C-alpha cells in the first residue's frame, strides 16, 4: 500500500524535506529555551553586582527572544510546506481515482456500491491527506522533540536520564495493542461511513418517492440505524484511546514525582543545582508527552492504513473491458450488427443462470430492429453488449463483420448512440446536455436534433429556452420531456447504430409516432434497435426479435410473427384488449 501511494509524492520530497527541517528547527528552539532560563538563574546566583545581573538578564532574554522568533519561522515554514504537500498529494490521488473509476465497466462498478466509491474518493482521500500532513508535522516534531529533550536531559544528569529506558517496554506494549486492535476497528468504521452515505444518497435521489408514499419516518429510522452503527463503531475506536491515555498519564505523573524526589536528593548531596531540577523535569515531561503523542498518532496511522487499503483496492481493480493491443479503427463504418451464438451472465465467476442463451441474428445496415418480450427476459442485457458495456461470456458480437472486442473502445462507442432505460440528464443547461452527444455541435444542430425528437416546442416554452438550467438532473422536467431530450442527445451524433432502450415509454403515442417518423426520414443509414413494451412502437420494424427467458423465440416482421408466433400473438392480443377496455 505504501509503495502504491508513495508515487503520488513524486516531486514533493524536496518540500517535505523543507517541512521536516523547519519542524526540527522549531523543536530545537523550543527545547533550548529552558536551558537559557536556567542560565539566568545561575548568573543571578553568582553575579557580583546588580549591574551584572541586569546585563545577564537582558542578554539571556534577547537570546530567548531570538530563539522564539527562529522557532516561529521554522513553524510557519513547516505549516505552509506540509499543507502544500498534502494538498497536492490528495489532488493527484483523487484525480487518479476518478480517472480509474471513469474507465470502469459496468461490471467493475457493480463490485463497489456508488456510495462506497464516493466515500473512498472523498472521506478516505481526505483522511490520507491529513495523515500526510500529520507525518510531515507531528511525526517529525514528536521524535525531534523527544530526541533533543533526551540529549538536554542527559547533559544535565546522565544517571537520572537512564531511568527513561524502563519506559521502552511499556511503550512497545502500547504500540502493539494499538496496531492489533486499532486497524480492524477503523476498517469497520470506514464501512459504516459507506453505509451512512448510501442511505443519504438513496434518500435524496428518491425523495419524491419517499414523500409520495409518506415514508419519511421509515427513512429517518434507516438513517438513524446507520448513524447509530457508525457512532457505536466510533465509540469502540474512541474506547481504545480512553484505555491508552490513562496508562500513559499514570506513567507520566509517576515519573515526574520520581524526578522531583530523586532531584531533591541529588541537590541535597550537592550533585545538582535546584534550578537544574526544574529544567530536567521539563525535559522529562517533554519526552513523556511526545511518547503519548506517538501513541495517539499511531491511532491516526491505523485509520490511514484502513483508508489507504480501500483506496488502493480501487486503484488495483483490474478493468475487465479495455482496448485490445492493436485496436481496430473503422474507416467507413456501415452499422451492420451480428450476434453469433451469444450467451451472457452477469456473474461470470459464479454458477448463476445465463441471462441470454445462444442468441443469433443479423441486422443489416439501416434496418430497424424491434425487441419485445416480458420483463426480465434480457432485452436490455442484449443491447448492452453492442457498445461493450458488458462482454459476452460466450459467442461473438460483430459490427460490420468485426468482433466488438477488437474495436478501439472510443471509436466503437462514438459510432453508437444510446438512450438507456433510465433517463440521465446532468446539471447544466438544456443546450449543454444535448452537446453531450456531440461536443462541437452548433446551435442549429441542437435545434434540429430537438425537433426530430419532438422536444423543440417544450424547450422553447421553458423560461430561458435552450439556456434553461436543469436542476438536479432534470427534476424540473416530466418523464416524457426527459426522454425526448435523451433521444435528441443520441440523435445529434448521427450514429451508425442507435439503441433506444424503452426510451419512449413516458411519451404519448402521437408524439412517439412523430419520433419514429423522424427515424425513417433522417436516419435511413442508421441501424436502429428499439426495445419497447408497446407493439405499436416496433410494428413497422424490418425485424422484430421476440425474447423469452433469455432466448429468441421468434424473428420476423410484424405480419410474419402475428401469423406463426404464439408469444408475439399473445402480446398483441393482450395489448389490444387493454386498449379496447
Language-model features: where?
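A short amphipathic helical element positioned immediately N-terminal to and/or at the very start
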Residues: 1-12, 117
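Hydrophobic alpha-helical transmembrane segments of ABC transporter permease domains
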Residues: 10, 21, 25, 29-33, ...
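An intracellular "coupling" helix at the cytosolic face of ABC transporter transmembrane type-1 domains
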Residues: 11, 103-107, 123-136, 140, ...
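Transmembrane helix-loop-helix hairpins at lipid-water interfaces of multipass membrane proteins
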Residues: 13-77, 81, 154-159, 261, ...
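Juxtamembrane helix-loop junctions of ABC transporter transmembrane domains
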Residues: 21-22, 29-42, 67-114, 118, ...
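Helix-loop-helix
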Residues: 47, 152-166, 175, 180, ...
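ABC-type nucleotide-binding domain
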Residues: 53, 330-581
Amino acid at each position: 500500500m505504501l509503495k502504491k501511494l508513495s508515487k503520488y509524492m513524486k516531486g514533493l520530497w524536496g518540500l517535505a524535506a523543507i517541512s521536516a527541517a523547519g519542524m526540527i528547527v522549531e523543536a530545537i528552539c523550543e527545547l533550548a529555551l529552558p536551558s537559557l532560563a536556567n542560565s539566568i538563574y545561575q548568573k543571578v546566583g553568582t553575579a557580583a553586582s546588580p549591574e551584572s545581573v541586569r546585563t545577564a538578564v537582558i542578554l539571556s532574554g534577547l537570546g530567548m527572544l531570538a530563539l522564539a522568533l527562529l522557532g516561529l519561522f521554522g513553524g510557519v515554514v513547516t505549516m505552509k510546506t506540509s499543507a502544500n504537500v498534502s494538498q497536492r498529494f490528495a489532488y493527484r490521488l483523487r484525480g487518479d481515482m476518478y480517472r480509474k473509476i471513469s474507465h470502469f465497466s459496468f461490471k467493475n462498478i457493480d463490485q463497489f456500491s456508488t456510495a462506497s466509491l464516493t466515500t473512498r474518493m472523498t472521506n478516505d482521500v481526505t483522511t490520507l491527506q491529513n495523515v500526510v500532513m500529520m507525518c510531515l508535522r507531528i511525526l517529525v516534531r514528536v521524535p525531534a522533540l523527544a530526541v533533543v529533550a533526551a540529549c538536554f536531559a542527559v547533559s544535565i544528569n546522565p544517571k537520572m536520564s537512564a531511568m527513561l529506558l524502563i519506559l521502552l517496554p511499556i511503550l512497545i506494549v502500547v504500540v502493539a495493542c494499538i496496531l492489533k486492535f486499532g486497524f480492524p476497528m477503523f476498517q469497520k468504521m470506514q464501512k459504516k461511513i459507506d453505509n451512512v452515505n448510501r442511505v443519504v444518497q438513496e434518500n435524496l435521489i428518491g425523495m419524491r418517492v419517499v414523500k409520495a408514499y409518506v415514508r419519511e419516518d421509515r427513512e429517518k429510522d434507516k438513517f438513524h440505524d446507520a448513524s447509530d452503527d457508525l457512532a457505536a463503531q466510533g465509540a469502540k475506536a474512541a474506547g481504545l484511546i480512553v484505555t491508552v491515555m490513562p496508562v500513559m498519564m499514570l506513567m507520566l505523573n509517576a515519573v515526574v514525582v520520581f524526578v522531583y524526589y530523586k532531584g531533591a536528593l541529588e541537590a541535597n548531596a550537592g550533585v545538582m543545582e535546584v534550578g537544574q531540577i526544574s529544567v530536567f523535569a521539563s525535559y522529562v515531561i517533554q519526552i513523556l508527552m511526545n511518547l503519548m503523542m506517538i501513541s495517539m498518532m499511531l491511532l491516526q496511522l491505523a485509520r490511514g492504513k484502513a483508508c489507504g487499503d480501500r483506496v488502493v483496492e480501487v486503484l488495483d481493480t483490474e478493468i475487465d473491458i479495455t482496448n485490445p493491443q492493436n485496436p481496430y479503427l473503422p474507416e467507413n463504418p456501415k452499422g451492420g450488427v451480428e450476434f453469433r451464438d451469444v450467451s451472457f451472465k452477469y456473474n461470470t465467476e459464479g454458477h448463476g443462470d445465463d441471462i441470454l442463451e445462444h442468441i443469433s441474428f443479423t441486422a443489416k445496415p439501416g434496418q430497424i430492429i424491434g425487441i419485445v418480450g416480458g420483463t426480465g427476459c434480457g432485452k436490455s442485457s442484449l443491447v448492452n453488449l453492442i457498445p461493450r458495456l458488458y462482454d459476452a461470456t460466450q459467442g461473438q458480437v460483430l459490427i460490420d463483420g468485426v468482433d466488438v472486442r477488437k474495436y478501439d473502445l472510443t471509436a466503437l462507442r462514438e459510432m453508437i448512440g444510446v438512450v438507456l432505460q433510465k433517463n440521465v440528464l446532468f446539471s447544466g443547461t438544456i443546450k449543454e446536455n444535448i452537446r453531450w452527444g456531440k461536443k462541437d455541435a452548433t446551435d442549429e444542430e441542437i435545434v434540429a436534433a430537438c425537433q426530430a425528437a419532438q422536444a423543440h416546442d417544450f424547450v422553447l416554452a421553458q423560461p430561458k429556452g435552450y439556456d434553461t438550467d436543469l436542476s438536479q438532473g432534470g427534476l424540473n422536467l416530466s418523464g416524457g420531456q426527459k426522454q425526448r431530450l435523451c433521444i435528441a442527445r443520441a440523435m445529434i451524433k448521427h450514429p451508425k447504430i442507435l439503441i433506444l432502450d424503452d426510451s419512449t415509454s413516458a411519451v404519448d403515442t402521437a408524439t412517439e409516432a412523430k419520433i419514429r417518423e423522424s427515424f425513417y426520414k433522417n436516419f435511413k443509414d442508421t441501424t436502429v434497435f428499439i426495445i419497447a413494451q408497446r407493439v405499436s412502437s416496433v410494428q413497422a420494424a424490418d425485424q422484430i426479435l421476440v425474447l423469452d427467458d433469455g432466448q429468441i423465440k421468434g424473428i420476423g416482421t410484424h405480419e410474419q410473427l402475428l401469423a406463426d408466433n404464439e408469444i408475439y400473438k399473445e402480446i398483441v392480443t393482450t395489448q389490444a384488449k387493454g386498449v379496447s377496455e
